[in-house]
Amino acid sequence: MIWKKPTVNEITPEAYDEVSNLKHIEQCGRICYDSLNKMTEWSYGDFYQTIVPKAKYNPEECCDFHLSVLEHATIYLHIKPSTEKELWLVDFFIHNPYSKVNENAPMGGGIRRTEHTYNQDGPYPGVDYYITTNWRVLFENEAKMVNALGLEDSIFDFTQSYRTLTPDSCYAIRRTFVVETGIDITREFNRHRCLSISESSTRWIDPTLPNHGGHVPFNDFETGDHTLLFTDAYKSAEENYKRLRRVSLRPQIARKVLPLGTGSTVVYTAFEEDWNKVLRLRSKKAGAKGVHPDAILIADMIYDYLNA
């Protein structure tokens, strides 16, 4: 076994062109599968093809794919509609629960357009709309959008001319963090539905193999006078895991003997305003009370990033 200190690192991209987004998707996915060492300058294309359906996406048929990592790739669009297609596109994002739309925000902020505050006259021609969405929204809705807009190319190609590669304060900004802590603490954060979440796989990854560290990681926390008890318990759990693996049981079966203190790595992405809502419930620095001390530790580190 090995003790691992809780950590938080920000991996929000600096650019949002298509290649940068694909590289970000690969990075988030490889964190889940502990294969960052396989990333190269050009590996993003092949990796993307391993996590999405080879045929045209059908949500009723395609379920055995890792689409959650697509959510971490943020897409920023600036649309000043003058055609029916552009008006339809703005309307789509206003009603999409995973997107945020700011209207007329040359100095930042502006008017937030949502489904609940939406003027039923529809988007207005000639008005600036600053849209923040993510790759999965376009991917899962592509058939609907292509059909509604009468496109011959993909929705990704159609929206290229509206992309903003370096977003400013006109947009609702999204931030991505990599969190290393125990599974018991990731559960605290995974309850927040505003977060896009991709967690390291214990179904496919055997941490006791040399290429995955050679030991089961356990979250390092304040054990007081009971350090030896926890150490013995974790060593026993690791040995039981190894014993099950030695009789050819797969990781997804052997993992059943691992405790909630087992270390985990999670990628979280959310709008800044949603992060602030989470922190008000989890971070001592944001005024939260009665929160698990290990969750406070993680939340306070995220708070420091957001307020740097």
Role assignments for model-derived ranges:
Residues 1-308:
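Family-specific signature for flavin-dependent thymidylate synthase
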